[in-house]
Structure formats: structure tokens, C-alpha cells
């Protein structure tokens, strides 16, 4: 039997009146049932823990299967044998006594989506029982999601939601209050933590714990007080030096066990599968080696230990999505000791198709480090490694292009697949210069999250970049500053509309076909796996998703509500059932 997951991160609840909601939350909790608003119903209710097993021979028939091959063929059937696509066409595939036939009944099937720039390993390390709130649109939906999560959380354990959401996404454009959190979860501590540094919010049970910790002997000589306000608010920390939200995070992290991390890792994989994400290029972010410290923020993890729970599950045969791990080097030291040792002693692209090392990304040294950063680019080229740099404006992109050109005069990088990520601004000249060096552009589709001024164009210029002919992909940059759910970012790419309903990206929209192609076949190039994943073609690994609605025909707003009815990875059904 394959690993089949039903993610516990969001759970389905009936829509109730406010009085019914409060009464049930204060009693035994809200039962699981159908009928949760579409923004919340991103995966089925939780089931039993999945079990390992080999891929099954499958025939998927009577569907609308978008292959994303060179001709964008749409076929009706797919045969899967030994974890690979055996055929994709319009004739009934051959079958044996051991073949399972699944009637798609006209449903839409697409290749498994690929995240070309993400921080999913950070999600796998979240403390507490993390609850996905990135799909909620109001305080009421937040309450329903938390109350539903409560049902599967043991008494005394923290219910958390850390990163991936922003108050812009909620109709009230504010945090829930302590009272509102109490209405949802009166008997377990709750902590919601925004982006990298907070601020955060807790309920009465959580405030009681934090108040006691503040009043007691310090658990670390450098810790600051959480100082939760009467309304549950916890002030943001700084990027360095700690602060109230970082102290709250530290208290949860220091009690997290390895089994807790394995559970969080399983939850992260299950949620990804539930929204159709089957492969990820992880970008680390702000690596911080050594023991936990109260100054560390949500994006600080030990880059040498953060993969331990994922590796353990991989050894047990329990990983259900693909992971490629990049190495971010964040040193300003002119000697670049860590980068040099990494390039000298690490293998890039080492592992198997379910879990392997990547290369350098999302940078080899901080972009603002001047000569140190330029030397880091040279060292990566000298070692023959793939390289990435994330840029936040046109000046940074100009700096990267000039550095790549300088390095390319000394070492040929044209076959190494060097990249630039995010790219909110661009010029045709810079694109052409990148293309001449064999580079690719990963377009960040996440700026709708913080956009609140309809007069400000947020980028990236999807249309300009896609029309250039350079190798291109699209990403969401979850799970700190943006959601993991790819459909929220695809919606922005095809509409240019932010959370306030304002069009904030000019005329830079992609077609639906283009956007999804970039999130599948396009992104496979950035993982060096275009011959294995990204399209539904004979010989490729069997990663595909049966959607709950037709992405190509539903109204724009429903794109954000798409979820997977069934996700197949490596020929195994890892989410849902038909």
C-alpha cells in the first residue's frame, strides 16, 4: 500500500452560527464534517497514519489530462507502471490482473506542481501543532480552522500557526484578539506568529504560560520577556537582538522533541500534497548553526541539523514529496571559510529522486557584501556549481548580471544553470545578457501578499520575462513571507489582483496555460530534472494531480480555491482517493 495522507493542518468543519460556534468550541470541540468555506477546505479531514509500500500499476481513464508536453496535448488516459508513465493517450491502456483502474469521470489532471523557490524544510521544523491559515480570508475562518485543529491536538500542547499568512488576506485586516482565540480554543495554548519576526498573538491559556515564564527564573541568560498584553498581543522581535516574539518562539522550540519534528515534517509533506505540490527546491534561509538561542527568529535554523527529521523519514521510506536542498551561505567573512568547505567537501545533486542535495542558493554570500559577494560568485564558478541570487530591485539585478559576466570571462558558466530569483523589475537588455550566459529567471509571484496600495506596481513583469525566451519559472517563496499554496500565486500571475481586489501588476499577466506550465515543466529545469518530472509523458516519473475543478475554465476567483482530489508521486497515491 502506498503512503496516503490526509493532512491534519486544516480540518473541515460545518458552518455554524456564532452562538453555535462558541458553544461547540467551549465544549468538546467542533466535529469534522463537510461544508467548510472553500478558502479553508484545502484538504480532507485527517485519517490514519499512512503506510509505506511499492508503486502500484495504475490506469487513469476518462479524464481531461493536460500533459504539458511540447504540443500541450490533452489526452483521456494515462498508464503508470513501476512508478513511471508508461503511456499517455486516448486509447484504453492495456491492463493485467494487478492493474488498478481509476475512472476520472471527466476530471482535470495536470502534472505535479514544482516549487522552484521555497522554504518547506522550515515548515517541517515548526514547533507545536502547526495549523495552516494561509487560505483563510476572515477572523471567522481563522477561528473555525483553529477549533477544528484542536480536535487532534493533545491536551496541554500548543496549537500554532507560524508564517505563510498576512493580515492583508483577512477581510478585517487585523489580528484576531485574545478573546476571539479563546472562543475558538479555550483549553489549549495558541500562538500565531507572522512572517520572520512577528508580531504574534496568543490566547488566555498561552498568556498564562508566558506570564509564568516571564515571572520565573530566566531559562536563558539572554532571553527577554514575552510580555503578552491583555489582548494577547506580543510585540515583534528585531532581526538581531531578539525581542518578545522571538522569546515566545524560543520557549516553544526548546521543548520540541525529535518525534515532534517528525510529526511536523509529515504534516508539511501532507499539506503540500493536498495542494498538488510534488517537488520542491528548498532555499534554507538565514542559517544559524549551534544551539538554540532566544535571539533567533522564525527563519533561523541550524543548517546542519534542520534536515534530520526529513532524512529520518526518508530512511523509513515515508517521504511522499520530492525535495532538493540548496545551501545558503550567509557569511561576510572575506575568507568565506564555510563556502569554501562546502564547495570542497559537499556533492551537489547527491541522493535519489525523492531527496537530494541541490547547489548554492539562494545566495553564496549576502548581496550587500561587495567584494566578498563577488569573490563568492567566483568560487562557485571555479567549483563548477550551480548558483543562485535573489534580487529585490533593478539595481541588485544589474549588480548580479555584471558579476555573472565578469565570472563568465574566467570560467564558463553557460552550462551550469546559474539563476536569478524574484526579479520584481527587469529590462530587455538585462534579460538578453542573462540569456546569453545560459541563465534562468525564477519569477516571484508572492508580492500580492503585502500589496495594499493600488497605485504601486509590485511585479514581477511576468509577460515581459516570459516573452523574452529566457529559461523561466515561477515560485511563491513560502512559507515565511508568503503562502505555500501555489494556486494563490497562480491566481496573481493570471490576474494581477492583490488581496484587496486591486490590480497591481499592470498588463503583465500570464495566460492560465502559461502560468501552470511554468509551475510544472518550467520549474523542472531549475531542479535539473526536466527529463524526469514536469510533464505527463512516457518514461517520466509518475507525478500527477487530479484537481477538484477545471483550472482552465472556472471563474478567476475559484483558482484560489483549487485543491487536489488525488495526488500521485512516483506512481504512489500519496493524497486523497477517487
Functional labels for PLM-detected ranges:
Residues 352-362, 439-446:
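Non-cysteine beta-strand/loop elements that form the S-adenosyl-L-methionine
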Residues 38-48:
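Signal peptide processing junction and immediate N-terminal pro/mature segment
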Residues 29-31, 50-61, 66, 70-341, ...:
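Divalent metal-binding segments
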Residues 344-354, 411, 434-436:
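Acidic (Asp/Glu)-rich catalytic clusters
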